[in-house]
Curated annotation (Swiss-Prot):
Belongs to the LeuD family. LeuD type 1 subfamily. Transmembrane segments: none annotated. The gene is leuD. Catalyzes the isomerization between 2-isopropylmalate and 3-isopropylmalate, via the formation of 2-isopropylmaleate. Pathway: Amino-acid biosynthesis; L-leucine biosynthesis; L-leucine from 3-methyl-2-oxobutanoate: step 2/4. One of its GO terms (cellular component) is 3-isopropylmalate dehydratase complex. This is 3-isopropylmalate dehydratase small subunit. Pfam families: Aconitase_C. It comes from Roseiflexus castenholzii (strain DSM 13941 / HLO8). The lineage of its organism: Bacteria, Bacillati, Chloroflexota, Chloroflexia, Chloroflexales. CDD domains: IPMI_Swivel.
Amino acid sequence: MHPISIITGRIVALPAHDIDTDQIIPARYLKVTDKSGLAEGLFYAWRFDAEGKPNPDFVLNRPEAQGATILVAGRNFGCGSSREHAPWALQGYGFKAVISPSFADIFRNNALKNGLLTVQTDEETWQQLVSLFEEDPTTEVIIDLATQTVTLPDGRQARFPIDPFTKHCLLQGIDQMGFLLNEEDAISAYESAHPPRVVTTARS
């Protein structure tokens, strides 16, 4: 994982609500454990037609959407079955963050643990972002993890929630295992200071 501090990038809006993980990445792509190549399957049923040709009407296939790194998605994004391949596919495509009024809990947890920032905003900010993209597809926003803010082109800022432990891990670019490894000395010191068996008054 790479440290996340400030993400500055163009947005692309996919405002449909209740986009589930099967729509994000079809089940046939779940047979692999290698993250490479999963970008091909991202929103496959929408990006391609029945013959496998790109659908020119889908937003990600439009020229103005190329290079966007921040996805603005509808409510309850990532609902459905749990699959780490969903955030992997989004990252493989080039997305560094997803902004939505709400996320499915399992998707949000999987995304954050894999270094994909999920930004939950209020409805007003979300609607403004969707409108900005429709008016100007080159719109850029700034996401500051340290201050937990999203800055819009007009300077307006909106805060987003994130738990302190996850925030720390993302800022440091480590996962839960990496955090434990960083605390190895403290863990060893604790174990050395405590007996392997807890003394009680209970009879064996």
